[in-house]
């Protein structure tokens, strides 16, 4: 199909040697993998141990990026919890713990593994809106924490992805391109559907099949040398 890169899928082999062989047959390299952090609900040492194990795997695969998402109190995987109006809001102490932890993880990733930590904002998590992304970006070190820019998740929660990419293009080190069907998002709101139910109903789609205008977004990324 012409693909040269892939993120690590849920069903991919966990042994790097096995995965390498499967990918080499297809001319594909690994670029990134999701990491679930629980910085405000688990001891940092526990999160760090899991993080290091995943970094070692990604380094063996030759990847340069890890995409972290804070999953403490996340409702994204709860089938019966409406995605709108039910997400957890961090207090000031939790924000401090979260941002301090992200800085520590990012420093480990960069200095010990040569991998960039990119933070993945996500529907149903503690960092979903632009205001929450702003607070995280303001309180983390650009040297160690970058943004995983996801067009779909920003649009889903009512933000303008073009505004975001203009604001943070120089801290974006990974991009997810999703499109949104606004009529399905409206259905999700009206029927108090969960995130997973919304996915199944078709809230997300491929670029060009939804409401996002990608041309200006691509121009900002290209002009910045992404």
Where would I find each of the regions flagged by the language model?
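N-terminal pre-domain/capping segments
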Residues: 1-65, 92-104, 142, 146, ...
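Acidic/histidine-rich catalytic cores of soluble enzymes
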Residues: 5-6, 100-211
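Conserved residues at the C-terminal ends of beta-strands
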Residues: 9, 69, 178
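Generic structural signal for helix capping and beta-alpha/helix-loop junctions
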Residues: 15, 40, 75-76, 126-127, ...
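Short glycine-enriched loops at secondary-structure junctions
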Residues: 23, 69-74, 181-182
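A short helix->loop->beta-strand "cap" motif at the edges of active sites that frequently abuts
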Residues: 28, 63-64, 115, 224-226
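N-terminal small/glycine-rich loop or linker at the start of catalytic domains
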Residues: 31-37, 74-85, 194-198
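Active-site acidic/histidine proton-transfer and metal-coordination neighborhood
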Residues: 44-147
């Amino acid at each position: 199909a012409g693909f040269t890169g892939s993120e690590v899928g849920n069903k991919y082999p966990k042994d790097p040697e096995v995965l390498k062989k499967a990918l080499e047959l297809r001319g594909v390299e690994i670029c990134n993998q999701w990491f679930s952090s629980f910085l405000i609900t688990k001891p940092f040492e526990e999160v760090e141990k899991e993080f290091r194990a995943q970094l070692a795997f990604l380094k063996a695969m030759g990847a340069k990026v890890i995409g972290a998402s804070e999953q403490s109190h996340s409702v994204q995987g709860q089938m019966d919890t409406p995605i709108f109006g039910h997400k957890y809001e961090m207090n000031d102490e939790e924000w401090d713990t979260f941002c301090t932890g992200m800085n520590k993880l990012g420093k480990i990733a960069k200095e010990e593994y040569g991998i960039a930590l990119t933070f993945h904002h996500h529907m149903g998590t503690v960092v979903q809106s632009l205001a929450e992304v702003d607070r995280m970006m303001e309180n983390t070190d650009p040297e160690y924490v970058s943004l995983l820019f996801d067009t779909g998740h920003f649009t889903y929660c009512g933000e303008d992805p073009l505004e975001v990419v203009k604001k943070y293009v120089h801290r974006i080190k990974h991009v997810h391109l999703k499109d949104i069907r606004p009529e399905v998002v409206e259905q999700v709101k009206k029927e108090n559907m969960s995130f997973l139910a919304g996915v199944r109903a078709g809230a997300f789609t491929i670029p060009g099949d939804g409401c996002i205008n990608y041309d200006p977004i691509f121009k900002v990324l290209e002009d910045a040398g992404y």
